[in-house]
């Protein structure tokens, strides 16, 4: 195929492919916790809140991803703190941070001299061809840390995802794990922004998990298979986007959505075939 023949000639393609594989692994593992813990709305809030830090860093001439990282982690920890203390409803805190982050980001980006709409679009919808070797290294470090953590603390995190009270009764430090996982979700989101963009990124955390969950209810199975599905969807979408000249993020989400529809329809077809027999 054209993509694979060009892969050895263009460095940006190898960076994009490596980023797709690594982000698929991280989003698959972290997404399992997010979906099972019913934190999808929280993840969406963190994703959009990160745009505030991105805009401030862009205005100041600093690294936008570093700014987004700080803003996202602080937002995630703030939401967890507000929810655990009961100072404000968690969904209200998420809604506030979601809208404020987007507003702050748009404001500071527009104030930057020489600002163009293309600067905004690259972060909202992703621009995988701009992924650098440094981005790939950062994703590789995050992936290694997540895989090590998944091997060491799979059971405590699984208990936390399904029943926090049960986890507490087993002596698991639920508050520490909640804060750590919230920060991990934030870091995963920010390091994947260049690939999917802020608008589409939440789908990469949820769609692979939904696909595997349609076939299995086991947390362990979902945690093992969701990264494989995410990687396959990322690579297939990247290849399709290159060959058909369409946005990579949209191609990836379309591929995963089509897979989910097929997986959901298969049992219905089997039931109809069984009834007819």
Predicted regions mapped to residue ranges:
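Helix-loop-helix "hairpin" substructures at the membrane interface of multi-pass membrane proteins
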Residues: 132-208
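Loop-to-transmembrane alpha-helix initiation sites
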Residues: 16, 64-70, 91-95, 140, ...
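Cytosolic-side transmembrane-helix boundaries in multi-pass membrane proteins
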Residues: 246-277
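Small-residue-rich segments of transmembrane alpha-helices in multi-pass membrane proteins
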Residues: 49-59, 97-108, 130, 174-179, ...
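Membrane-interfacial amphipathic/re-entrant helices at transmembrane-helix boundaries
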Residues: 1-25
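Transmembrane helix-bundle core of multi-pass membrane transporters
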Residues: 6, 10-15, 94-152
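Transmembrane alpha-helical segments in multi-pass inner-membrane proteins
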Residues: 195, 199-250
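Short loop segments and helix-boundary regions at transmembrane helix junctions
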Residues: 32-115, 212-224, 241-244, 268-269
